[in-house]
Amino acid sequence: MTQDNKLQVEAIKRGTVIDHIPALVGFKLLSLFRLTETDQRITIGLNLPSGELGRKDLIKIENTFLTDDQVNQLAVYAPHATVNRIDEYNVVAKLSPTLPDRIDRVLTCPNSNCISRSEPVDSSFAVKKRHDELHLKCKYCEKEFAHHVVMANG
């Protein structure tokens, strides 16, 4: 048997590729980061084979580039992701997310009494690292949650 080195997800001419997303996290990223709020073509690969992760997800968005803030906010969900900026089918920049100090507009506060759940305000969380565990503190109710609690609420 010969190994076939074909791309499993079609290459894009210009745009962003988010690679090395943990398996089953790709759809959540599309929703949370509002990546589908575009008329550009989006290609998603789910449960693709990965030497590092075993399985991974992949997102390709044509003619769209993530801001540095968006790239860094990915670190909460996909700390080992790589974000590639593509032009003329070539990688022109390769970025790794860095944990930001703050995450805005992406997450929902788990506190059902928080004003951010009922008022037209953008959510905002301070990111804290405590003993190798991430905690997120809501700007409005000032409650602090383990990051997995906020993620499950997303």
From Swiss-Prot:
Binds 1 zinc ion per subunit. Transmembrane segments: none annotated. GO terms for molecular function: metal ion binding. It comes from the Bacteria. One of its GO terms (cellular component) is aspartate carbamoyltransferase complex. GO terms for biological process: 'de novo' pyrimidine nucleobase biosynthetic process; pyrimidine nucleotide biosynthetic process. It holds the Pfam family PyrI_C. The keyword Metal-binding applies. Zn(2+) binds at C109, C114, C138, C141. Its cofactor is Zn(2+). InterPro entries: Asp_carbamoyltransf_reg_N (IPR020545), Asp_carbamoylTrfase_reg (IPR002801), Asp_carbamoyltrfase_reg_C (IPR020542), Asp_carbatrfase_reg_C_sf (IPR036792), Asp_carbatrfase_reg_N_sf (IPR036793). Involved in allosteric regulation of aspartate carbamoyltransferase. Belongs to the PyrI family. Contains catalytic and regulatory chains. This is Aspartate carbamoyltransferase regulatory chain. The lineage of its organism: Bacteria, Pseudomonadati, Pseudomonadota, Gammaproteobacteria, Enterobacterales.
